[in-house]
């Protein structure tokens, strides 16, 4: 039976630096079998809806995610079996018809705004991190990312932030902070916190290799 991989959950508000923190951990272990799985990949398929309906979907609500499939995939990876992870198309606001093959690893970083919201997912994690970043910084980062990478207009980003992103953060995301083992203020720029986390991960990996 394969050894259980280390599962690290990384969450926080949109634009808060979750991905940067995750990449900082990934880059610290270049010689290890380590990979990141994004909750965003598991947004539900909306191909049955019109484009206008897809645009108006609340993507910051737990119902927007197929977390059941994500949990199923992580359990498969824990068991040592590869999975085919969906690829989400942000320009069309639905899943594409493509997937990518994820092989079993020694460490998985599970990243997303709501990865600590579901107890079943939390229970699979060995380390749970919450990236805590000021609201003003998050909205600036979100505007830059969505305009450059996702083809969004400034007006649509601001409207979505005020009507959906901000209220959903306070209703669903911020409350999951209580489940975190470590809260990281200011994200990846908090080098002390990142170093401590990397030291902990290295320690767990070393113990796992001895077992």
Swiss-Prot record:
Residues annotated for ATP binding in this entry: 12-19
One GO CC term, this protein: cytoplasm
Alphabetical GO biological process terms: CTP salvage; UMP salvage
Keywords: ATP-binding, Cytoplasm, Kinase, Nucleotide-binding, Transferase
Domain of life the protein comes from: Bacteria
Catalysis: reaction(s): uridine + ATP = UMP + ADP + H(+); cytidine + ATP = CMP + ADP + H(+)
Bilayer-spanning residue ranges: none
Subcellular location: Cytoplasm
UniProt feature coiled coil, ranges: none
Pathway the protein acts in: Pyrimidine metabolism; CTP biosynthesis via salvage pathway; CTP from cytidine: step 1/3; Pyrimidine metabolism; UMP biosynthesis via salvage pathway; UMP from uridine: step 1/1
GO MF term set: ATP binding; cytidine kinase activity; uridine kinase activity
EC number of the protein: 2.7.1.48
Family: Belongs to the uridine kinase family.
Name of the protein in question: Uridine kinase
Biological source species: Streptococcus thermophilus (strain ATCC BAA-250 / LMG 18311)
The organism's taxonomic lineage, starting at the top: Bacteria, Bacillati, Bacillota, Bacilli, Lactobacillales
Gene: udk
